[in-house]
């Protein structure tokens, strides 16, 4: 099978995407597929460079990659691709929309408000949420332009920074607890990972630098494990996920809260999904093969 590994892109996460793409290529080649590296520098590259491939493995992140646009283009071209479809991808990229659906479905998530201008910040609403808060681009990823703000004085500057990366900014209550991630493969939860950043929170450096954080497989207490698994499965169902997705949570006082869903989890050597799969004996090559297999089974 001729597999095009699509990477690069036009988002702030381009370098992360290129790193993911290189790793994916290296291990897909072990499976004896014909691999075509497809580096995207501008949107129209997808139409041109994807011609002739049998399957697109998406190693993209951020806008025009994780937001449903590339998925829509590939469906128009009748090229099967890895991961979730356009609707789920678009919703999960929009943190505000994701949290509204989670709240409607009675899935725990931290309180938040969204703003689209530094001149129209509702400080009273933020007071109700309670400090400290995370200020971040609504549709960003990899914790780019994400800041932990401890009082009213720091809000405007953090909002202005985040608005450089997105037209909307999320201001979310900082729920202090243990950060965990649940990797879902074909609707089943792989072993849970605890994320212990060496910095104050799991920022860009902690995510991608060697030694930026400790990510370890953990055994949750039985009742908590059940709650976490039920919540991850509820997210999968309510947001109509397919193939694979990563559900990030915080556990506070024995109660899990969903932070966000990642529909194209990173595939670098430091990435969480391969670590979780490896804990049940699934090698990186086997994981990639499963993603291809399950993706081909999805009716688009």
UniProtKB/Swiss-Prot annotation:
<keyword id="KW-0067">ATP-binding</keyword>
<feature type="binding site">
    <location>
        <position position="248"/>
    </location>
    <ligand>
        <name>Mg(2+) 1</name>
    </ligand>
</feature>
<keyword id="KW-0963">Cytoplasm</keyword>
<dbReference type="InterPro" id="IPR011761">
    <property type="entry name" value="ATP-grasp"/>
</dbReference>
<keyword id="KW-0573">Peptidoglycan synthesis</keyword>
<dbReference type="InterPro" id="IPR000291">
    <property type="entry name" value="D-Ala_lig_Van_CS"/>
</dbReference>
<comment type="pathway">
    <text>Cell wall biogenesis; peptidoglycan biosynthesis.</text>
</comment>
<feature type="binding site">
    <location>
        <begin position="126"/>
        <end position="181"/>
    </location>
    <ligand>
        <name>ATP</name>
    </ligand>
</feature>
<feature type="binding site">
    <location>
        <position position="260"/>
    </location>
    <ligand>
        <name>Mg(2+) 2</name>
    </ligand>
</feature>
<dbReference type="GO" id="GO:0008716">
    <property type="term" value="F:D-alanine-D-alanine ligase activity"/>
</dbReference>
<keyword id="KW-0436">Ligase</keyword>
<keyword id="KW-0133">Cell shape</keyword>
<feature type="binding site">
    <location>
        <position position="260"/>
    </location>
    <ligand>
        <name>Mg(2+) 1</name>
    </ligand>
</feature>
<keyword id="KW-0460">Magnesium</keyword>
<comment type="similarity">
    <text>Belongs to the D-alanine--D-alanine ligase family.</text>
</comment>
<dbReference type="Pfam" id="PF07478">
    <property type="entry name" value="Dala_Dala_lig_C"/>
</dbReference>
<keyword id="KW-0479">Metal-binding</keyword>
<dbReference type="InterPro" id="IPR005905">
    <property type="entry name" value="D_ala_D_ala"/>
</dbReference>
<dbReference type="Pfam" id="PF01820">
    <property type="entry name" value="Dala_Dala_lig_N"/>
</dbReference>
<dbReference type="InterPro" id="IPR016185">
    <property type="entry name" value="PreATP-grasp_dom_sf"/>
</dbReference>
<protein>
    <recommendedName>
        <fullName>D-alanine--D-alanine ligase</fullName>
        <ecNumber>6.3.2.4</ecNumber>
    </recommendedName>
</protein>
<dbReference type="InterPro" id="IPR013815">
    <property type="entry name" value="ATP_grasp_subdomain_1"/>
</dbReference>
<keyword id="KW-0961">Cell wall biogenesis/degradation</keyword>
<dbReference type="GO" id="GO:0005737">
    <property type="term" value="C:cytoplasm"/>
</dbReference>
<comment type="function">
    <text>Cell wall formation.</text>
</comment>
<keyword id="KW-0547">Nucleotide-binding</keyword>
<feature type="domain" description="ATP-grasp">
    <location>
        <begin position="99"/>
        <end position="293"/>
    </location>
</feature>
<dbReference type="GO" id="GO:0008360">
    <property type="term" value="P:regulation of cell shape"/>
</dbReference>
<feature type="binding site">
    <location>
        <position position="262"/>
    </location>
    <ligand>
        <name>Mg(2+) 2</name>
    </ligand>
</feature>
<dbReference type="GO" id="GO:0009252">
    <property type="term" value="P:peptidoglycan biosynthetic process"/>
</dbReference>
<dbReference type="GO" id="GO:0005524">
    <property type="term" value="F:ATP binding"/>
</dbReference>
<keyword id="KW-0464">Manganese</keyword>
<dbReference type="GO" id="GO:0046872">
    <property type="term" value="F:metal ion binding"/>
</dbReference>
<dbReference type="InterPro" id="IPR011095">
    <property type="entry name" value="Dala_Dala_lig_C"/>
</dbReference>
<dbReference type="InterPro" id="IPR011127">
    <property type="entry name" value="Dala_Dala_lig_N"/>
</dbReference>
<dbReference type="GO" id="GO:0071555">
    <property type="term" value="P:cell wall organization"/>
</dbReference>
């Amino acid at each position: 099978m001729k597999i095009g590994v699509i990477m690069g892109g036009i988002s702030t996460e381009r370098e992360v995407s290129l790193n993911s793409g290189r790793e994916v290529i290296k291990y897909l080649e072990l499976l004896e597929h014909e691999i075509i590296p497809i580096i995207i520098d501008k949107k129209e590259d997808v139409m041109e460079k994807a011609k002739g491939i049998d399957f697109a493995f998406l190693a993209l992140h951020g806008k025009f990659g994780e937001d449903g646009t590339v998925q829509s283009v590939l469906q128009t071209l009748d090229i099967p691709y890895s991961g979730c479809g356009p609707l789920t991808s678009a919703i999960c990229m929009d943190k505000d929309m994701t949290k509204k659906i989670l709240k409607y479905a009675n899935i725990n998530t931290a309180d938040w408000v969204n703003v689209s201008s530094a001149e129209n910040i509702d400080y009273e609403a933020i007071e109700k949420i309670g400090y400290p808060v995370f200020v971040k681009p609504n549709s960003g990823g990899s914790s780019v332009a994400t800041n932990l703000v401890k009082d009213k004085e720091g809000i405007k500057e953090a909002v202005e920074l985040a608005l450089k990366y997105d037209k909307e900014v999320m201001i979310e209550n900082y729920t202090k607890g243990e950060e965990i991630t649940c990797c879902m493969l074909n609707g089943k939860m792989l072993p849970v990972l605890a994320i212990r950043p060496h910095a104050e929170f799991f920022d860009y450096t902690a995510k991608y630098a060697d030694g930026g954080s400790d990510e370890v497989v953990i055994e949750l207490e039985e009742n908590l494990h059940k709650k976490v698994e039920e919540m991850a499965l509820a997210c999968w169902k309510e947001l109509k996920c397919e193939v694979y997705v990563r559900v990030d949570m915080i556990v506070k006082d024995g109660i899990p809260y969903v932070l966000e869903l990642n529909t194209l989890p990173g595939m670098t050597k430091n990435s969480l999904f391969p670590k979780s799969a490896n804990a049940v004996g699934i090698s990186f090559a086997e994981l990639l093969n499963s993603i291809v297999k399950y993706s081909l089974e999805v009716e688009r």
